[in-house]
């Protein structure tokens, strides 16, 4: 659904539990390998970034056996990572982008938010990353927001969602994920973006409920 809209995303292959193989193109290493259906970085760790076929099959086997899931292998897109929240249905609006700051990440480690970086408060990965409101030129901010809204529309997301993006050194913007049910705690990146747009947390939740109700009234 993204390709017809001119939206960039990593080329990929799917390794199902039944050993079938699907591909979105000829893949180039390194690849980022993760469970197809899980969330919250479950199954993502230090061995998720693979550089050869042997490591790829080891990771696929781990996901199949230990997590009982199919594996998704994507070409790794290096660059700055942004989260762009989107609100709305017929006229979705993008919120201010949030950037993942990897400044304190362990040296040499791939810039990926794995399970340690998200949940293990004692880890170097957790301590070395933080989400901050992105400081960007107006033109770049507008580009990120446009890609987010285009992806949101293309996948027919409703009410609210978050689009995860990577900006390469050459200025290309790739969609890594479109999360139609993203984390909504008061401390979440989505809430941070909404606050920056002048929408306080109670109003944000109220607006999401209103958007859902409007759909059912039509």
Features from the language model and the residues they span:
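Residue-level structural signal for beta-strand termini and adjacent loop
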Residues: 15, 98-100, 179
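Short secondary-structure boundary/hinge segments and terminal tails
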Residues: 19-21, 81-82, 170, 212
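Short small-residue beta-strand/loop micro-motif enriched in glycine and branched aliphatics
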Residues: 40-43, 127-128, 185-190
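ATP-dependent carboxylate activation and anion-phosphoryl transfer catalytic cores
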Residues: 3-7, 135-218
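Short connector loops/turns at beta-strand edges and beta->alpha or beta->beta junctions
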Residues: 36-38, 120, 181-183
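Phosphate-binding site of ATP-dependent enzymes
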Residues: 53-146, 167-174
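Active-site nucleotide/adenylate-binding loops and adjacent lid/helix of ATP-dependent enzymes
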Residues: 1-72, 78-80, 91
């Amino acid at each position: 659904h993204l390709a017809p809209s001119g939206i960039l995303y990593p080329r990929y292959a799917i390794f199902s539990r039944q050993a079938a193989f699907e591909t979105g193109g000829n893949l180039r290493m390194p690849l980022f390998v993760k469970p197809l259906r899980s969330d919250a970085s479950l199954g993502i760790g230090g061995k998720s970034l693979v550089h050869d076929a042997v490591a790829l099959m080891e990771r696929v086997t781990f996901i199949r056996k230990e997590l009982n899931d199919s594996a998704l292998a994507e070409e790794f897109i290096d660059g700055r990572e942004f989260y762009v929240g989107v609100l709305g249905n017929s006229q979705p609006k993008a919120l201010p982008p949030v950037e993942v700051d990897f400044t304190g990440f362990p040296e040499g480690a791939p810039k990926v938010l794995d399970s340690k970086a998200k949940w293990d408060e004692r880890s170097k990965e957790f301590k070395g990353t933080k989400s901050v409101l992105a400081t960007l030129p107006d033109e770049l901010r507008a580009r990120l927001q446009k890609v987010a809204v285009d992806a949101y529309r293309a996948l027919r997301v409703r009410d609210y969602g978050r689009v995860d993006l990577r900006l390469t050194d050459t200025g290309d913007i790739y969609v890594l994920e479109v999360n139609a049910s993203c984390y909504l705690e008061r401390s979440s990146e989505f809430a941070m973006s909404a606050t920056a747009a002048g929408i306080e947390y109670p109003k944000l939740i109220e607006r999401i409920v209103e958007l859902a109700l409007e759909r059912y009234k039509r």
